[in-house]
Amino acid sequence: MQLNSTEISELIKQRIAQFNVVSEAHNEGTIVSVSDGVIRIHGLADCMQGEMISLPGNRYAIALNLERDSVGAVVMGPYADLAEGMKVKCTGRILEVPVGRGLLGRVVNTLGAPIDGKGPLDHDGFSAVEAIAPGVIERQSVDQPVQTGYKAVDSMIPIGRGQRELIIGDRQTGKTALAIDAIINQRDSGIKCIYVAIGQKASTISNVVRKLEEHGALANTIVVVATASESAALQYLAPYAGCAMGEYFRDRGEDALIIYDDLSKQAVAYRQISLLLRRPPGREAFPGDVFYLHSRLLERAARVNAEYVEAFTKGEVKGKNGSLTALPIIETQAGDVSAFVPTNVISITDGQIFLETNLFNAGIRPAVNPGISVSRVGGAAQTKIMKKLSGGIRTALAQYRELAAFSQFASDLDDATRKQLDHGQKVTELLKQKQYAPMSVAQQSLVLFAAERGYLADVELSKIGSFEAALLAYVDRDHAPLMQEINQTGGYNDEIEGKLKGILDSFKATQSW
């Protein structure tokens, strides 16, 4: 067999011409240590703060520490099979999560992946988990209410759209119950809800999702979950992911409500990450930037003006204000509100609802302490009728608490003091409310009107609950148009006052409670 040199050279030329060289430049490094979800990488010279790092097995880590000759990163997801010597590379991207209306009614994890078994998400794109909060000029003052459906909250500690109102209290005082009822009450208000569960048991979250579904509120809600069994990195990032999903609605001229349950567990997860990254510990072993951890999150809850919305949507949405209202939850230890994280969040937010163990155990639920609970901006957002009728409630309770303390030592009390004590007891009883039973503005207004105008004076303390139930059943049956008018307008004038007085007079005559 004879070899033809010409043919061979032609064949080689063809093969060389067909050879496709695609060069890809990437910044590659090597894992030098793995410990509790934190990896140290050598060789990523151009890595940026907060950049996603691609790991073997289609996983990612986020770069948090940029040091002279190494990078400290937290792994998002399982890390047991990661080992020294493995190759990793920079992606040039920061963490993004899916956003859009298709997420409503779904349960997702921190990275936006569905975990409810209902198939893939129908999303409108991706949004960065870290975003700069709107500036002062882009904001609008808070002047529209968010009704929680709780008499004690909507009357004394009103919440406005775009406000940050802290729910604070010891464990088992009804913090989550208050937040879940606030979500249930938004079924027909048009406010979209995001519930972020951080460091909770999967069984607890499953129960919350079931309750939302039972009460028809899940279709209006996105549930973001980072359970206690998940890595500290996912628990730390969950609130930012939920906030990005809420900002989608805010920036398009809609209203959204986000609940962080709870930020104490997020701070603990961040402390764990920081200590593993060898950052210097400060008070209570928290890192120095734990204030910034919460402030950069909560400042993103805001009411933005129409110009901001128009600029963001490139003119598609005009004349609409958007808002993101935040209800962060903080768990205290033995009622200590002066601990590090509680004081930080109190100073960041626009008020707090303080839930007390003693009140809860005494059967006063919601266990709101009106003495140290406050809403700094919500008063401007209250409806006219609620503002008018709720003024005397806080005063009556404050006087009652003061007199109750003195009456323990005094044996003979004058009639005026006895009346005040009796009125205070009845108002306290009236503000009690069952879980999953939010009340409309009209129902609350009627009940507050009865307390304000002395209609409870001759009702026995033990009958206050049945008096309220019978009164609400009576108006729903015979005076539904007036209730609808109050719910729609929230107005208060002499005519409405006269009608409310007439309803209560005719109801008292029936003695049906």
Curated annotation (Swiss-Prot):
Its main location: membrane. Produces ATP from ADP in the presence of a proton gradient across the membrane. The alpha chain is a regulatory subunit. Belongs to the ATPase alpha/beta chains family. ATP binds at residues 169-176. Pfam families: ATP-synt_ab, ATP-synt_ab_C, ATP-synt_ab_N. It is found in: Cell inner membrane. It is a peripheral membrane protein. Keywords: ATP synthesis, ATP-binding, Cell inner membrane, Cell membrane, CF(1), Hydrogen ion transport, Ion transport, Membrane, Nucleotide-binding, Translocase, Transport. It is an enzyme of class 7 (translocase). Its EC number is 7.1.2.2. PROSITE patterns: ATPASE_ALPHA_BETA. The record marks 373 as: Required for activity. The gene is atpA. It catalyses: ATP + H2O + 4 H(+)(in) = ADP + phosphate + 5 H(+)(out). GO terms for molecular function: ADP binding; ATP binding; proton-transporting ATP synthase activity, rotational mechanism. This is ATP synthase subunit alpha. The keyword RNA-binding does not apply. One of its GO terms (cellular component) is plasma membrane. F-type ATPases have 2 components, CF(1) - the catalytic core - and CF(0) - the membrane proton channel. CF(1) has five subunits: alpha(3), beta(3), gamma(1), delta(1), epsilon(1). CF(0) has three main subunits: a(1), b(2) and c(9-12). The alpha and beta chains form an alternating ring which encloses part of the gamma chain. CF(1) is attached to CF(0) by a central stalk formed by the gamma and epsilon chains, while a peripheral stalk is formed by the delta and b chains. InterPro entries: ATP_synth_asu-like_sf (IPR023366), ATP_synth_asu_C (IPR000793), ATP_synth_asu_C_sf (IPR038376), ATP_synth_F1_a_nt-bd_dom (IPR033732), ATP_synth_F1_asu (IPR005294), ATPase_a/bsu_AS (IPR020003), ATPase_F1/V1/A1_a/bsu_N (IPR004100), ATPase_F1/V1/A1_a/bsu_N_sf (IPR036121).
